[in-house]
A protein has these predicted regions:
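N-terminal helix-turn-helix DNA-binding core of bacterial DNA-binding proteins
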Residues: 11-49
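Alpha-helical linker/hinge and terminal dimerization helices associated
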Residues: 16, 26, 63, 92-104
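Basic, amphipathic "hinge/linker" alpha-helix immediately C-terminal to the N-terminal HTH DNA-binding motif
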Residues: 21, 72-93
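Extended, folded domain segments that form the structural surfaces/walls around functional sites
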Residues: 29, 37-42, 57, 92, ...
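Canonical helix-turn-helix DNA-binding module
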Residues: 39, 43-71, 75
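C-terminal regulatory/oligomerization modules of transcriptional regulators
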Residues: 94, 98-146
Length: 146
């Protein structure tokens, strides 16, 4: 299967991967949720080439995940903001963070990045639950079907 063909697949995972399916795109989105909006800031934080960054930002704008808005005239410069579609990616990113912390923990020298509640300051542990029942969703209690 070719990369460009993923968006036409019946599988929602394949279609999602057609939008966010590489490391740079995921890291750009991570930084967006941390408040990064400007091209130079993304480039500095990620160490990514201008060409690759421009490509990933364009794809995210084209997919409706980010919007491109001018913040300066002469020369015109743009910043990138999460759209409603982009903000809907947050639970995926949070779950990926939790998985990464469990499976690929920090080296012990650098403190790990943790999610904490803005209200209490306490650590937050994400759990994927069924909206109707509030029960955790696990491989043993759900299946995919058409």
């Amino acid at each position: 299967m070719r990369w460009q063909e993923l968006k036409d697949e019946a599988c929602p995972v394949a279609r999602a991967m057609s939008v966010i399916g590489d490391r740079w795109t995921l890291l750009v989105l991570r930084d967006c949720f941390r408040g990064v909006r400007r091209f130079e800031a993304f480039q500095e934080r990620l160490g990514i080439t201008r060409h690759v960054l421009a490509d990933r930002l364009r794809k995210l704008v084209d997919a409706g995940v980010l919007s491109r808005e001018p913040y300066q005239d002469g020369p015109v410069r743009y910043e990138y903001r999460l759209t409603e579609t982009g903000r809907a990616f947050h639970p995926v990113l949070v779950t990926l963070m939790a998985w990464g912390e469990k499976v690929v923990p920090c080296d012990g020298e650098t403190p790990p990045l943790r999610l904490v509640s803005r209200a209490t300051g306490e650590p937050v542990r994400p759990v994927v639950v069924d909206e109707a029942t509030g029960e955790p969703i696990t491989p043993s209690n759900v299946r995919a079907e058409r």
